[in-house]
Design a protein with these regions (language model features):
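Acidic, metal-coordinating catalytic segment for phosphate/diphosphate chemistry
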Residues: 86-172
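DNA-contacting surface of Y-family translesion DNA polymerases
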Residues: 1-111
Length: 172
């Protein structure tokens, strides 16, 4: 029927909300130091949390993954990932980075030359539907802080305001 121009499936009128948000990169050079990997993961968390805030979403969990090159056999291949659930769904960059870095400490193995790392925020839901019994004035202050950071970065360029854990030089 579609070949005759008769649609079989109706088109969605509105785009459906995303269910996850991934930010990952391959590094320009192999990374061996934990601090450089930590900066990269923190930076990816900041980008991912900014993306979900722009869509008015919150995440229930963050997954961190790292890997070495499968083609450099002399160094051995290593790949690992871990997920941590948030007690309350969030889009707070500070909370996301803190949890992601705690996971990174578990999966990092010294002596490997990492080629790629990334973060995935999962279980995304509408921020409006995220009210709970434990919401407080502190949460509202953090939300205002995140909006201020996002507005400043939008106005003056990405990463104008950032967390110290994301590094300054970004040599990776």
């Amino acid at each position: 029927r579609e070949l005759r121009g008769v649609p079989c499936i109706d088109l969605e009128k509105t785009a459906s909300k995303r269910k996850s948000c991934v930010v990952s990169r391959s590094f320009g050079k192999r990374i061996e130091k934990f601090q450089e990997l930590e900066e990269a993961v923190a930076s990816y968390c900041l980008n991912a949390s900014e993306k979900i805030r722009s869509e008015n979403l919150v995440a229930k969990a963050v997954m961190v993954f790292v890997r070495t090159s499968p083609f450099q056999k002399q160094f051995g291949f290593y790949s690992n990932s871990r997920t941590v659930d948030f007690p309350i769904a969030t889009n707070n960059s500070i909370e996301i980075v803190k949890n992601a870095l705690s996971v990174l400490k578990v999966i990092f193995r010294k002596g490997h030359r990492y080629q790629k790392a990334g973060v995935m925020l999962t279980g995304l839901t509408d921020a409006e539907n995220n009210e709970n019994l434990f919401s407080s004035a502190k949460d509202e202050r953090i939300n205002r802080l995140m909006r201020s950071i996002d507005n400043t970065n939008y106005r003056y360029g990405r990463s104008t305001l950032s967390l110290a854990s994301a590094g300054v030089r970004k040599s990776w």
